[in-house]
Amino acid sequence: MIHDPAQLERERPDRLRVLWLSTLAFTLMFAVWLMFGVLGVPIRKEFGLSDVQLSWISALAILNGSLWRLLAGILADRYGGRLVFTLMLFFTAIPAYLVSRAGSYEELLLYAFLVGFAGNSFSVGIAWNSAWFPKDQQGFALGLFGAGNVGAKCQPLIISTWRPHFGSS
């Protein structure tokens, strides 16, 4: 922990950059993690799924987003939040895209499970921001980072705006 006020002041722009970028990344990850709540009805119609089948898709994403949180936090502590968050963004983007290319219910289940890794981003961001902020500023920083949960509320607006441009109504 840094106790020298001059050193803290020099690092302030870096801390704020970490905070804003991690909050933006968490917003994106949270939106992806919960995307089946918004996309569920169109997916059910397109694939002719039952309510139970659709609920399995959402459940797999949510479950996987909960299973690995401890490990994700440990990895962030060990290798740094920037690396772990970047890898999570990249490796979650692939199955998120593949959801749009899925041709079967089984593929949707697989991609939903893989998309679920996005739910572990909370642990990574908390560890990352905690390492960058002094104790007396962590409450503000972690509160702002946690506001990334708004990603779930941004989905309907974003998806309803983009879907018509990708061949779906």
Task: Identify the residue ranges that each predicted region occupies.
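Cytoplasmic helix-loop-helix junction between adjacent transmembrane helices
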Residues: Y111-G148
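Extracytoplasmic
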Residues: R17-D51, A72, Q155
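Conserved MFS/SLC helix-loop-helix module at the cytosolic interface between two early adjacent transmembrane helices
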Residues: L67-E106
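Helix-loop-helix hairpin linking two adjacent transmembrane segments in secondary transporters
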Residues: F145-S169
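Helical-face signature of the major facilitator-like transporter fold
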Residues: A25-F26, F30, I62, A96, ...
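Residue-level signature of mid-helix packing/kink "hotspots" within the transmembrane helices
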Residues: L34, I62-L70, N120, K153-C154
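Hydrophobic alpha-helical transmembrane and interfacial-helix anchor sites in secondary transporters
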Residues: I43, L75, W162-R163
